[in-house]
Amino acid sequence: MSIDLSTAQSIITKALETGQQHGFKPLTVVVLDAGGHVIAVARQDGASNNRFEIAQGKAYGAVALGMGSRALMERAEQQAYFITAASAALAGRLIPVPGGVLVRDEAGTIMGAVGVSGDSSDNDEIAAELAIKASGLTAQVA
């Protein structure tokens, strides 16, 4: 099962609300289905340019490799050659820093991923993780 539009929009709303509640810089949030296709995206007023591409890259890498982008960052630190090769295989659409969080259902099946960009990578990840959990789904950051 993949994320539907209604769920994607709910996740986006909750991520943006989380950012506002925590005083984060303006965010861009992208929700992808299990195949890496964009379901929904929102960019807050004032978010800097290219945040869509960064958020999408965080989410795309997560869903493509089956791990949160924090785990991808850790993998890049340990095995840079793997991330370089994976990035090439994914046509450069992999951004291995926190902020790309897998979405799993109650059975543990990957439903898609959420990518957030706009503040620090750690804060981006917080917004994604809390939004996924608030939507009743499981967030996998690592």
Per-segment meaning from a language model:
Residues 1-142:
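Flexible, solvent-exposed loop/hinge segments and secondary-structure transition points
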